[in-house]
Amino acid sequence: MRNHVSRYLTALIAVGCAATTAACTSLPSNSEPQALRSFEASASEEPQGPVEDQEPDLLLRDFYEANNNPQQRYSLARRYLTHRASQSWNPAPETLVLDGIEINSAADSSTKNRRYDVRGLIVGSIGEGGEYRPRNERYSTTIGLEKVDGQWRISTLPDQIVVQRNELWNHYRQKQVYFFDTSGTTLVADRRWIFQEKMGHNDNHESALLSLILTGPSKSLAPGVVNEVPSGAAYAGYHDDYYQFTGLSSLDEDSLKRLTAQSVWTLALAEVPGPYRFKFDGATMKSPINGSEDLTVDDFAEYNPLPQQAVDSGLYAFNSNGVKKLNQGVATPTTGTLGNTHNIESMAVSAKTGATAAVRTAVEGDAKTSTLMLGPIGGQFVDVLKARRLTSPSFELSSSSLWVVKDSDQVVRLSRSSENEGIVETVVDTSELGSLGKNISALQLSRSGVRAAFIVDGSVYTATVARPNPGQRKLVNVQEIIPSLANVAQSLAWQPNGSLIIGTSKPDAPVWIVAQDGSLGSKLSAGNIVAPVMNVAASQSTLYISDARAALELPNSDTSTTYWREVQGLEGSRSVLVVPR
């Protein structure tokens, strides 16, 4: 019954997440990990326990290698401990991710007892359910070893799992679990780190994903999404061709439909073969379209979390000569207000409706002023907001509202009034930003509108968009997404796959791609780029930047290319590219 039928699975693999047939488990967890996906056994050079007569420093390094395997409460790692240490060791649920592990012998070591100072830079941590959080702090501890029957074993150690970043990528995979935003209309990706197990069972992949849905969203995302699953709900396994759940009797019909849609899209985008059948407390879920028990993403197409490019949404560019539309290397000036405006500083276009927002600048006396105007491409625009400085506007998914930062310290949301067709301005609550809210130079909403990325004093942060009350918005769970780029970030944009493209002032690393959760930051080729990179944009196929001299592009499929190509139709001019989104 599980025929893999979906036209939606041809795009959007997350940064650094290659397709794999490995089995996986979500980590860390206080319970026994669940296997994700069968794996064909192969020879492994990884240590399976202490090597006889191994030197203590080498044994300690192998112990940290064994930290990557959480099965049976880290039973492999416990083999490196003395019996007493193994009995008392109780690792915390949080796993620390270090850039590297430095091991040095302590001064008070002896022939029978050794002590080692272990240091490193903490770049992130993985919490329960596999949520990654970026960090930037030093790690330091001391490990004691003693001889047991002539063999070195670890006798004293902290209750903490520590892994190296490169080993994280070798032993874990990233999977997306989907939850609805607070409106109940948009699915939002929740990225989790999953342990890649070397042995598994046929249905473990689905089991882990569906269990994560029932467990609920990650802590950082939770304020921006809804979790309608009651606390007593459980996944009962795959039996008689059905995924079976219990404890859902309190949910109404609409809630059950949303849970089914979550499950279908999570399984489908994890490449679990469909169609899918579900039983909730013994009741069979059926297609809302044709009543079939065999469900696919087509039955819930209205919740498709993948970006849908509108017909003729196009590609635009602007410079001192106004706005142009690009088509197959030809730049054609637009008509209306934009075609005649020569002082545009930033611009955004909704791929869904074609609604357009642009910021134009002017010098009045000794002061610069910025004006936000709204209208359709090719039509007449109206002024809606004026300030000393305005960041590039960013539309919400519906395009009926947009965000902009006013004078670097006030985030405002502009919405069309349902009563009089006017524009309503509300201030976004940024109280959790503290001092970070005083000098915001860029802010962009993710496609779903549940996340915001912004730049403060050259550092990049993300936050979750909460809705405390109707019409209100608040930025919560603020975190610096990539501390290594502190003080150099100039521009940012969300890619269709949920990662960020960031332009910087660093000549040797002017453009970066950063994973949604900050777990990976990859610098792209500096090639022929002249920093700083003041504008960035991304379509499903191409990355665009504007450096100090020109508009350049690079295929998304080949980011290893050394040189960026000047955008055809814009040669010889410094232009800014605008991708409708």
UniProtKB/Swiss-Prot annotation:
Claim: Nucleotide-binding is one of the keywords in the record: no
Superkingdom field: Bacteria
Membrane topology: Lipid-anchor
One Pfam family named in its UniProt record: Germane
Lipid moiety-binding residues (S-diacylglycerol cysteine): C24
Positions in coiled-coil regions: none
Residues annotated as signal peptide: 1-23
Compartments in which it is found: Cell membrane
Keywords associated with the record: Cell membrane, Lipoprotein, Membrane, Palmitate, Signal
GO cellular component terms listed in the entry, alphabetical order: plasma membrane
Lipid attachment residues per UniProt (N-palmitoyl cysteine): C24
Transmembrane spans: none
PROSITE patterns: PROKAR_LIPOPROTEIN (PS51257)
Family stated for the protein in its record: Belongs to the LpqB lipoprotein family.
Protein name: Lipoprotein LpqB
Organism: Corynebacterium diphtheriae (strain ATCC 700971 / NCTC 13129 / Biotype gravis)
Gene responsible for this protein: lpqB
